[in-house]
Amino acid sequence: MATMVPSVLWPRACWTLLVCCLLTPGVQGQEFLLRVEPQNPVLSAGGSLFVNCSTDCPSSEKIALETSLSKELVASGMGWAAFNLSNVTGNSRILCSVYCNGSQITGSSNITVYRLPERVELAPLPPWQRVGQNFTLRCQVEGGSPRTSLTVVLLRWEEELSRQPAVEEPAEVTATVLASRDDHGAPFSCRTELDMQPQGLGLFVNTSAPRQLRTFVLPVTPPRLVAPRFLEVETSWPVDCTLDGLFPASEAQVYLALGDQMLNATVMNHGDTLTATATATARADQEGAREIVCNVTLGGERREARENLTVFSFLGPTVNLSEPTAPEGSTVTVSCMAGARVQVTLDGVPAAAPGQPAQLQLNATESDDRRSFFCSATLEVDGEFLHRNSSVQLRVLYGPKIDRATCPQHLKWKDKTTHVLQCQARGNPYPELRCLKEGSSREVPVGIPFFVNVTHNGTYQCQASSSRGKYTLVVVMDIEAGSSHFVPVFVAVLLTLGVVTIVLALMYVFREHKRSGSYHVREESTYLPLTSMQPTQAMGEEPSRAE
């Protein structure tokens, strides 16, 4: 152990020689002693000490104190002297001497100075420490004495990791620690303990400023990057980047980019999984082969994933009509075009080459009204064929017409019934259809129910009219007048009377039939045959009896 000794102290050999010279033969036989108090004191560096030298010799001379320290005689008397030692900075030995009866007697005391360390510092920790690998704690201690009582302790939180004595000056104490997830964010520190308890002073503790450790786990696998293979100019598409087994995921840095264009990513973490989502929007100046890059950085290490992406421009297809609304009989040109490298097909007819338009002509007829023309466009991008379709509708202007198949020219209806005149007109612009009775301004509704009577009988002019002309169809309504209600009522009455008469006649005949036939008399009576009544006889006369 190295002990700090002030430069003003004499070499130990010189002191030994001085003590030997002061001792005279026969000193061991003296019966009086010289006491030095306090004996072997301990005090902090730079402190003061009051020393008393005394003897029981009745004929002692002046007591002297020999020391390299700064001293001052405070008081003295017969057989004693008091001194004050100031600015005691190092260990020292003091010697008191006096002559008693011509002989020199001496007494000594060893002063021990303790000093707290001037610097206790834990060396900086690595910015990031991978979990499962060792790292070294290093504590440096300057100053502090006595070294035999000085111990250095390395701590995690309040847990002791290592306890070692401070040996050299300056002292350096190290400990090897295996990094774990639990060490992330943990404070590490260094503490010195100067144990002066055996000297009755106590335990003096100095602690360094703590240093925080950050541990991490970064898998060797790259992130999973989900991005489109193709992206059209001025369109957007979501991009996702995910990495599992990351710790601490919340402290990872994510960089997402389309080429040299950094994407604004939203980063979320759940447990040890990190997910970054961004929207990639392609610019016109990025057309061609590009890369989507996802870069995850943690603990000074990086994991990266890349995906190829092609930015393309797909204009069209655009379908045009020379006349969107064409008169019947006119010539209409239909054309379809798209961007460069795009192959277009118009109503099944392909263009001569990619990038060229497709055309067709037609003579507009009534059947072409509302006809749709379809154009398909195909673009090849890195071996993939992309398709788009477009269409346009042609309107043809033609005069009004009435469909004879749906509008009967002769109608035979009964009086006082409800019917619908089913007639439809067509044309572009759509015509107005009216049916007026000849010789009058009477109009019958078309397409809605109405009540028919004999006044509707006659010939009607059904006319469809528009800005393109007029079309007339003759419709004849034949209304059958119904017979009088008296005849069926009279017939019903006669039938009723006939039925009643027949019923009464049948009832009479049935009753008379019950009254005719033979009668039975009592057994004691004489049997008399009945005779028929003569027509000339009265109803009340009895028949004559034979004598």
Curated annotation (Swiss-Prot):
One Pfam family, short name: ICAM_N
PTM summary: Upon stimulation by a physiologic stimuli becomes rapidly and transiently phosphorylated on serine residues.
Tissue/organ expression: Leukocytes.
Subcellular location: Membrane
Membrane topology, Extracellular segments: 30-485
GO MF, one annotated term: integrin binding
Secretion signal, residue range per the UniProt entry: 1-29
UniProt superkingdom: Eukaryota
Cytoplasmic membrane side: 511-547
Entries under InterPro entries matching the protein: ICAM (IPR003988), ICAM1_3_5_D2 (IPR048679), ICAM_N (IPR013768), ICAM_VCAM (IPR047012), ICAM_VCAM_N (IPR003987), Ig-like_dom (IPR007110), Ig-like_dom_sf (IPR036179), Ig-like_fold (IPR013783)
GO BP, one annotated term: cell-cell adhesion
Record-annotated Ig-like C2-type domain positions: 46-103, 132-197, 234-301, 329-382, 416-469
GO CC annotations, alphabetized: plasma membrane
Keywords: Cell adhesion, Disulfide bond, Glycoprotein, Immunoglobulin domain, Membrane, Phagocytosis, Phosphoprotein, Repeat, Signal, Transmembrane, Transmembrane helix
Gene3D superfamilies found in the cross-reference section: Immunoglobulins (2.60.40.10)
Transmembrane segments: 486-510
Cysteine pairs bridged by disulfides in the record: 53-96, 57-100, 139-190, 241-294, 336-375, 423-462
Bilayer topology term: Single-pass type I membrane protein
UniProt keyword Signal present: yes
Glycosylation, residue list: 52, 84, 87, 101, 110, 134, 206, 264, 295, 308, 320, 363, 389, 453, 457
Function per UniProt: ICAM proteins are ligands for the leukocyte adhesion protein LFA-1 (integrin alpha-L/beta-2). ICAM3 is also a ligand for integrin alpha-D/beta-2. In association with integrin alpha-L/beta-2, contributes to apoptotic neutrophil phagocytosis by macrophages.
Similarity comment: family membership: Belongs to the immunoglobulin superfamily. ICAM family.
Quaternary data: Interacts with moesin/MSN.
Entry protein name: Intercellular adhesion molecule 3
Gene field: ICAM3
